[in-house]
Amino acid sequence: MNLFPAIDLRGGKVVRLTQGDYDRMTVYGEDPCAQARQFVEAGAGYLHVVDLDGAKDGTLSNYGSIAALAKQGGLYIEVGGGIRTEERIEKYLSLGVDRCILGSVAVTDFDLTARMLKRYGERIAVGVDAKDGFVAIHGWKEVSAEKGVDFCRRLADAGCTAIIYTDIACDGVMQGTNLALYRQLAAEVPGVAFTASGGISSEAELLELKKMGTAAAILGKSLYTGALDLKRCVELVQN
């Protein structure tokens, strides 16, 4: 199982939100590249980057920070937040970003998503965020009528091989992740590499996710608060 420590960017700073709420934001650092270097020193090989400004208003205000992270090297980097066009995908991939994450656009423009999956293959992942089991979009403010599991099946049929699934209720509150959900996804949507995201705050959870065949896990607030030690976690999932 791969571990993706997370860097969420707002105004070029490293921040964390609680349950996606921009009014409940904590700043953890001024220098994303320094943060990424710390992750590398702890043994990380992967990095999950979210452009929160892009997610909110579609701007590219963190483009310079993302370019610097890609240029720094040493990590497989996936980027999400505000990626709604092929032009933006091209822009990031040409920087050296390894994988782009499509979020709300996968719901609002499924045809574009299917085309991008066909064109770019494994360089595209889809982020599925669910509230009470239903797909949520636009910064989690709108909840659709489609169940997350059903949407994942549709994505798999369209050729999606990587889905980052977040249970919104768990995100940023450090009270554990929804293990039953990831077990269900693995059983009901075979052939997709699922990344668990939101609320992972113990080594026991990581081991359980690994045991059920989860492809990857994203670690955010648990690292920044010191609840989890990245070096130890990397060793744990690699053994």
Regions flagged by a language model, labelled:
Residues 8, 39, 47, 92, ...:
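Conserved, mostly hydrophobic/aromatic
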Residues 11, 19-23, 90-93, 97-171:
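Conserved anion-binding
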Residues 53, 61-118:
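Glycine/small-residue-rich loop that forms an oxyanion/phosphate-binding "nest" at active or ligand-binding sites
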Residues 60-67, 141-150, 175-183:
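Charged helix-capping and loop-helix junction motifs
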